[in-house]
Curated annotation (Swiss-Prot):
InterPro entries listed in its UniProt record: PDGLE_dom
Protein name in the entry: Putative metal transport protein HQ_3622A
Function comment: May be involved in metal transport.
A Pfam family it matches: PDGLE
Residues that span the membrane, as ranges: 75-95
Predominant localisation class: membrane
Topology within the bilayer: Single-pass membrane protein
Signal peptide: 1-32
Amino acid sequence: MKIISMSMDSWIQRAALMLLGLVIVAPFFGWTASIVGYAEPLENAAKMTGATDAAMNLNPGVLPDYTVGGFSGPIGTLISAGVGTVLTLIVAFGAGRLLES
């Protein structure tokens, strides 16, 4: 049982490092998307059909457009990526604990 535990710890460490790496490069992807003029396809379709004019924004979300108020684009994206990763891990570990019991 000890061998399984050690390999699980190693797997978790590798996964955590991979997630940390993705969080760190997230602002780069946001920056390159703005450079090439990328826009979400659903937003493009809404603009083409005129749906954005009639839309009401009732709840912009916790981190709208992957930004954090008061921070510049890349820094806000980095914070948003970190928050999203942590929340996802909390939900995943919680679900894992429920499935184990």
